[in-house]
Swiss-Prot record:
Complex formation: The complex is composed of two ATP-binding proteins (PotA), two transmembrane proteins (PotB and PotC) and a solute-binding protein (PotD).
An example molecular function term from Gene Ontology annotations: ATP binding
Source species of the chain: Pseudomonas aeruginosa (strain UCBPP-PA14)
Gene name in the database record: potA
Membrane topology: Peripheral membrane protein
Descriptive protein name: Spermidine/putrescine import ATP-binding protein PotA
Length: 363
């Protein structure tokens, strides 16, 4: 079994009375695109700074390829960091910016030229070496910053919210560029972001952080479909959170009391006990709307009324107010074959979902 490239063991970092990183342990594999995801103040950037050597843990250890990095200065680590601000030298050409760290390392000119040429090819800027940074688009400047970080052939590339300054369309284009680049160069990427969509699109695995701790570490599909906590369900994408109490457990099914709505069935997802408080997490796209629903033992359905709607192009977001006042968000595609009915505000509807469409978490 191949040992992990990076090991973070029980790392804690405090600033006075505030614990920014709280006993975090992670392993990151060679060639992995790994993302630290969380809201502002969750500890993700502090953890990244410790990986880079810009900060030191109060306790715990960080090992890269088996080497303890305690006391190893940033410039002596086989690690490079790409920042949101690009940090390019405006008086240097693109090629000169990329060559700069090699010159500082005393690399021979012939090798510098060859490695700069390859780095420009890697980021698809082979014809832009003579340009100045001001002559490039935001996405191109970001690629130059990445090329400069890669030219020294680090074992680990750290990216601190590198796309957050770009507009939405350019961000999407750069996400594809990053995925392809990481596959091509085979270097381990550790990516920090607060953007859930970015994390889901880019990553092999995601560590969702909250208040200095890792709430969940999983593949993107698992985190989205099977969140382990209310926080993760709420933070990742849109999600309906319905408070409930466990009434009974029957094999893989759980009977729960949705407060104010009555008893329904759900799929068992943890060691639930009767009387235990829980939350049914339900993604909007899992709910269907109809004027009436045929009774089905595998479905849950409630009457309600369309309170609000928001047209989003490919889908429409419906806010359905149920008879007890609870509101459900529902996403319906606008181009569904055979769909002729589009609901309007005030329409009476039934909201329905399969019993296994939701995911139970502890309250």
């Amino acid at each position: 079994m191949t040992p992990p490239l990076l090991e973070i063991r029980n790392v804690t970092r405090r600033f006075g009375d505030f614990t920014a990183v709280d006993n975090v342990s992670l392993t990151i594999n060679t060639g992995e695109f790994f993302t630290l995801l969380g809201p502002s103040g969750c500890g993700k950037t502090t953890l990244l700074r410790m990986l880079a050597g810009f900060d030191q843990p109060d306790s715990g250890e960080i090992r890269l390829n088996g080497q303890d990095l305690a006391g190893v200065e940033p410039e002596k680590r086989p690690v490079h960091t790409v920042f949101q601000s690009y940090a390019l030298f405006p008086h240097m050409s693109v090629a000169q910016n990329i060559a700069f760290p090699l010159k500082m390392a005393g690399v021979a000119k012939s090798e510098i030229d060859a490695r700069v040429e390859q780095a420009l090819k890697d980021v698809r800027l082979a014809d832009k070496g003579g340009r100045m940074p001001t002559q490039l688009s935001g996405g191109q400047r970001q690629r130059v910053a990445i090329a400069r970080a890669l030219v020294n052939r680090p074992r680990l590339l750290l990216l601190d919210e590198p796309l957050s300054a770009l507009d939405a369309k350019l961000r999407e284009e750069m996400q594809i560029e990053l995925i392809n680049l990481q596959k091509d160069v085979g270097i381990t990427f550790v990516y920090v972001t607060h953007d859930q969509g970015e994390a889901l699109a880019l990553s092999h695995r995601i560590a969702v952080m909250n208040q200095g701790r890792v709430e969940q570490l999983d593949a993107p599909e698992t985190i989205y479909s099977f969140p382990r906590s209310r926080f993760v369900a709420d933070f990742i994408g849109q999600c309906n959170l319905l408070d409930a109490t466990v009434e009974a457990v029957d094999g893989e099914r759980v009977r729960i009391d949705l407060r104010g709505l009555g008893e329904v069935q759900a799929l068992k997802s943890f060691d639930a006990q009767p009387g235990e408080a829980c939350v049914l997490t339900l993604r909007p796209e899992k709910i269907r709307l109809a004027q009436s629903v045929t009774a089905d033992s595998n479905e849950v359905h409630f009457r309600g009324r369309v309170a609000e709607l928001l047209y989003l192009g490919d889908v429409t977001l419906y806010i359905v107010e149920l008879e007890n006042g609870e509101r459900l968000e529902t996403l319906l595609p606008n181009a569904t074959p055979g769909r002729t009915k589009f609901f309007e505000v005030g329409d009476a509807v039934e909201a329905a979902w399969r019993f296994d469409a939701g995911h139970l978490v502890r309250a």
